[in-house]
Amino acid sequence: MEGKRYSNSFTSSGMVKEEGRAAYYKLLDSVREGDTVRIKRGVYATTEQLADTMIDVQAIVPGGVLCLFSAWNVHGLTTSLPQAYHIAVKRGRKVTLPVFPKVELHPITDTMFDIGGEDQIGSGYRIQIYNKERCVCDAVKYRNKVGMDVCAEVVNSYLALPDRNLSQLFDYADRLRVRRILEQYIALKL
């Protein structure tokens, strides 16, 4: 880990092996000394990276998208802090999760998975995350699981934004089959 830095992303043993055997042994020594932590097989992070509030989603769950509480927190739609990183994956996919940090997977069908995904830079990491409109639709869709108060907070926060896009919101609501319920929420708020 001493040599090349990978734009604040977690390091894989494959990347280090490309630099040579000596670099790989330095990585293993760093793990033994406690400067680097093994997240899961082949993925390593420094203690500074673990102290950060964001993780390298693509290193831990390749192809995963930040969703629900984690996405609401990043977009500033809720004041509650997530207890785990909520990551959406395509249904039927097998993923090995690390012990730390705590990750909750949410399997989603292929047709629903691609709706509203975008790339963002957060805490130096390039992350896949659902956009604000998709997040609002998810809050309405999972309102019984996350709680009505959290759902109302997300909808209210979105409606208070100056850059809200209601046409895109209703398009996503149609595709995610929550339009009728979302219209009821918005009718009460506006």
What are the residue ranges of the model-derived segments?
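Phosphate-handling catalytic interfaces
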Residues: 77-190
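Residues at alpha-helix termini
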Residues: 32-33, 74, 175
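Short beta-edge/loop segments at beta->alpha junctions of small alpha/beta modules
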Residues: 1-70
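Short, solvent-exposed loop/turn elements at beta->coil junctions and helix N-caps
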Residues: 31, 72, 91-93
